[in-house]
């Protein structure tokens, strides 16, 4: 609660921190252990930043007590949050957008962001989220993709209006009344919309859809299905 009220979030790990910094986020405070950090790519850049006055050197023992998880590459930083909205998205012609409704588990959202990053999706829009976009578990599971893929949160109604105004077709992933995803033309601007693994999409999305698609995979693995659709 304090972190959110102050507009701050925590990043652990050299890779995640560099993704964050390169995406324009400001370091508020940083704690680092050179003994651990120097073994990782990007250590020189992080140490140079630390010497500018935002870094505090700590021993391996102290760092071990501070770190949220093991193997975090010797650095943990408190960052200043940036809350992007739909108006901040700069989409190319015929974009691929991933839309997630009411996602609850930070680890799942992080994995979806990782898949979206690997597939070069142009944006991820999280509608009516039940988790914080700067949750430490989300940042960790995304391996920093939450900073490299434009990611915004909004209501489902706002997102639908945004997509319709830009002529981006809405494809909802669902089992009922749907066609196989590979029979659908995704060469134009496309938003792939998925709900939670437990309950799927709400009616507001089913009714707004231009087409309903399904993915012939056993189980309800949301992150796997997003990855498959993005690569298609």
Regions found by a protein language model. Give the residues of each.
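Structured adenosyl-cofactor binding patch, chiefly the S-adenosyl-L-methionine
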Residues: 77, 118-119, 133, 138-145, ...
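Glycine- and other small-residue-rich loops at beta-strand/loop junctions that grip anionic moieties
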Residues: 9, 101-102, 127-128, 152, ...
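Amphipathic alpha-helical repeat scaffolds
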Residues: 13, 104-111, 225-232
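RNA substrate-binding interface of SAM-dependent RNA methyltransferases
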Residues: 22, 47-48, 59-61, 83-84, ...
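Short, acidic/turn-prone active-site loops that include or flank metal/cofactor-
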Residues: 35-37, 61-62, 129-131, 197-199, ...
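Active-site/ligand-binding-proximal alpha/beta "capping" segment
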Residues: 171-226
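N-terminal positively charged helical leader segments and presequences
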Residues: 1-70
